[in-house]
Amino acid sequence: MTDGGMTKDAIGAGALAGEGLRAFFERDAITVARDLLGCHLTVDGAGGRITETEAYFPDDEASHSFRGPTKRNGAMFGRPGNVYIYRIYGMYWCLNFVCHPGSAVLIRALEPETGIAAMMERRGTDMLTALCSGPGKLCQALGIDIEINDRLLDLPPYALTPSTPVPIVAGKRIGITRNAEAPWRFGIQGSRYLSKPFR
């Protein structure tokens, strides 16, 4: 049973689509961030198991949605299960999944499982644990950029398959200065595929 009162079996065993996708994401971002851990994400067939996430809310000063909709963050106010992609430092893309409008989950890391050769080529490394160990690295490995922003996760090139529950650790979010004490970063306990260890 998830924190939102819904079993993952009830959501469906295959890739999330249609009403199943909406039901999974139309919950608070903390619940979704926890339930995304262990889920299998692919982009054009390359991907793996999500190992680390962060939750963001409209009333959260660290969130892009805090000051309301803009041209840049419009996708964050889309339907549950919508993809919101943005760039940091003028270089690195970051992948987020929308929950309630203005709430989203940042995908920080995953454990590579499929399309590994393509990911290694994009990243320029054969170190498996370093392929997707951070939001920018993850997007580079999966070939994610603004061209596949603002579309639902049941549309190509995305596929997201639910998982059975996994052991979870929580801690402070990374790289923010506002609302920095909120323990809204989540990871699979014991995973080697994280952006940074939990302390």
Swiss-Prot record:
Top class in the EC scheme:
hydrolase
Example of a GO MF term: DNA binding
Query: Looking at the keywords, is Glycoprotein present?
Result: no
Entry keywords, A to Z: DNA damage, DNA repair, Hydrolase
E.C. code: 3.2.2.-
Q: Which domain of life is it from?
A: Bacteria
Q: Which GO terms describe its biological process?
A: base-excision repair
Q: In the UniProt record, does the keyword Transit peptide occur?
A: no
What Pfam family does this protein match (any one)? Pur_DNA_glyco
Q: Which InterPro entries match?
A: Formyl_transferase-like_C_sf, MPG, MPG_sf
User: Per the similarity annotation, which family is this?
Assistant: Belongs to the DNA glycosylase MPG family.
Output the HAMAP family linked to this UniProt entry.
3MGH
Q: What is this protein called?
A: Putative 3-methyladenine DNA glycosylase
Taxonomy, top ranks, is:
Bacteria, Pseudomonadati, Pseudomonadota, Alphaproteobacteria, Hyphomicrobiales
